């Protein structure tokens, strides 16, 4: 299994746990709530990235088990709830290669999550859901 980068880590958002259903994770997510308007739009009642979204804070769009970032697309393959975190394995593609990645998610408040990875170095990143 390959190690992950912070963008791939974002795929954690579609996990299901006892406290959170996948449908509850659907939406637009970013590391900076003040950047929501610069990153996301709705086209035909569907969330989409604005043209220059990658110039602003990191973000992604979650629809069920599908997660779309500005440069990658992922599909959740497996979930394991250990009580305090949900461990996820996802298959991600950057348009050139496909790889499996592993990471954890913790619900840190209403419309807030913290994504973490232990490899290649420990990384922990908070995300907030944009109201769209």
What are these regions (language model features)?
Residues 1-7:
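Bacterial N-terminal signal peptides that target proteins for export
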Residues 20-24:
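Boundary at the C-terminal end of the N-terminal hydrophobic targeting segment
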Residues 25-26, 31-65, 69:
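Short, solvent-exposed loop/hinge segments that bridge or flank secondary-structure elements
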């Amino acid at each position: 299994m390959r190690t992950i980068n912070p963008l791939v880590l974002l795929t954690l958002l579609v996990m299901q746990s006892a406290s959170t259903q996948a449908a509850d994770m659907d939406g637009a997510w970013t590391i900076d709530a003040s950047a929501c308007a610069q990153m996301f739009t709705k086209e035909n009642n569907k969330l989409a990235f604005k043209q220059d979204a990658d110039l602003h804070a990191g973000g992604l769009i979650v629809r069920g088990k599908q997660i779309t970032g500005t440069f990658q697309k992922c599909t959740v393959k497996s979930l394991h709830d250990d009580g305090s975190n949900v461990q996820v394995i996802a298959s991600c593609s950057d348009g050139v290669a496909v790889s499996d990645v592993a990471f954890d998610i913790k619900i840190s408040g209403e419309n807030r999550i913290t994504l973490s990875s232990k490899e290649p170095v420990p990384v922990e990143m908070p995300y907030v859901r944009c109201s769209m």
